[in-house]
Design a protein with these regions (language model features):
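Conserved glycine-rich cofactor-binding loop
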Residues: 24, 31-32
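Catalytic loop of short-chain dehydrogenase/reductase
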Residues: 153, 159-200, 212-213
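Active-site loop of short-chain dehydrogenase/reductase
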Residues: 23, 78-79, 106-107, 152-166, ...
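Substrate-binding pocket helix/loop in short-chain dehydrogenase/reductase
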Residues: 121-122, 126-131
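The beta1-alpha1 cofactor-binding region of Rossmann-like NAD(H)/NADP(H)-dependent oxidoreductases
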Residues: 64, 84-96, 127
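Conserved glycine-rich Rossmann-like NAD(P)H-binding loop of the short-chain dehydrogenase/reductase
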Residues: 45-68
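C-terminal helical subdomain
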Residues: 207-208, 224-288
Length: 288
């Protein structure tokens, strides 16, 4: 069984609510990959971007820091606020939210992008790694959402977007990496619960997941995966832009796939997103 994929898709492209100039987007894990791609997309529209992530010094295998991302955001036309934030620590979260309000005065959208992953079986997943995945994926998503909510509810078109998959209960998605699947589905359950909880408050809570694997520095470290058969992270950024442009009062509780969103917006050719257009894209996790 797969939790409902989507509803309320606009068939006329992005909605009239797509003016993000001076709007504030709070993004966790925005130093690289999908998070940074989303940040740059909104920066091009003149948005204020909060980079809430841990990396302040370059990692030899995973390049990019919050300060590097901030420079790129400013160059793209946005305003950046890099804040070192471990989303497992509620004090750091609260401090990041307060810094955001002090600088920009509002939070209009939250993108819960930060995630920890270990594709390992039960006997190969020590509790330290288990706790990391649950601390970041479930607790972190919940805690950041909770901290941002009082300010989101003051926005005229507030959105929470979790980079999370549909809940697919096919046992094959649990068989090889039970801990990660449960932790990732925790982010999805936040969408189900919060969208229902705040459905009368005009707050949209949705999930976005890539239909195919996305080319990131982390993906290139996975043995046996052909990164050329992946898509650029810009496809997720374009889909996120479309979703956050929709009326928050009528678009909530959805589990969107990036390709589905863009098809609804009129996109028919996805070859420009491919790392190698001659390759067949590899489906992402949790999709049958």
């Amino acid at each position: 069984m797969i939790e409902k994929i989507s509803k309320n898709l606009s068939h006329t492209g992005v909605d009239i609510l797509s003016n993000f100039k001076n709007k504030t987007i709070f993004i966790t894990g925005a130093t690289r990959g999908i998070g940074k791609a989303i940040a740059l997309k909104f920066a091009e529209e003149g948005a204020n971007i909060v980079i809430a992530a841990k990396t302040v010094k370059p990692h030899p295998k995973l390049p990019g820091t919050i300060f590097d991302a901030a420079e790129e955001i400013e160059s793209a036309g946005g305003k950046a606020l890099p804040i070192r934030t471990d989303i497992r620590d509620e004090n750091q979260i609260n401090d990041a939210v307060q810094q955001t309000i002090d600088k920009f005065g509002s939070i209009d959208a939250l993108v819960n992008n930060a995630s920890a992953i270990s594709l390992t079986g039960t006997l190969e997943t020590p509790m330290k790694k288990f706790d990391l995945m649950f601390g970041v994926n479930v607790r972190g998503t919940y805690a950041v959402s909770q901290a941002c909510l009082p300010y989101l509810l003051k926005s005229n078109n507030p959105h929470i977007l979790n980079i999370a998959s549909p809940i697919n209960l096919n046992p094959k998605w649990f068989q090889e990496y039970t801990a990660y699947t449960i932790a990732k589905y925790g982010m999805s359950m936040c969408v189900i619960g919060m969208s229902e909880e705040f459905k009368n408050d005009g707050l949209a809570v949705n999930a976005l997941w890539p239909k195919t694997i996305i080319d990131t520095a982390a993906l290139r470290l996975v043995p046996g995966v052909d990164s050329e058969a992946s898509r650029d992270a810009s496809i997720m950024a374009d889909a996120a832009y479309s979703i956050l442009s929709k009326d928050s009062k009528t678009c909530s509780g959805n589990f969107f796939l990036d390709e589905e969103v863009l098809v609804s917006d009129g996109v028919t050719d996805f070859s420009n997103y491919m790392v190698n257009p001659n390759k067949t894209p590899i489906p992402d996790l949790f999709l049958d």
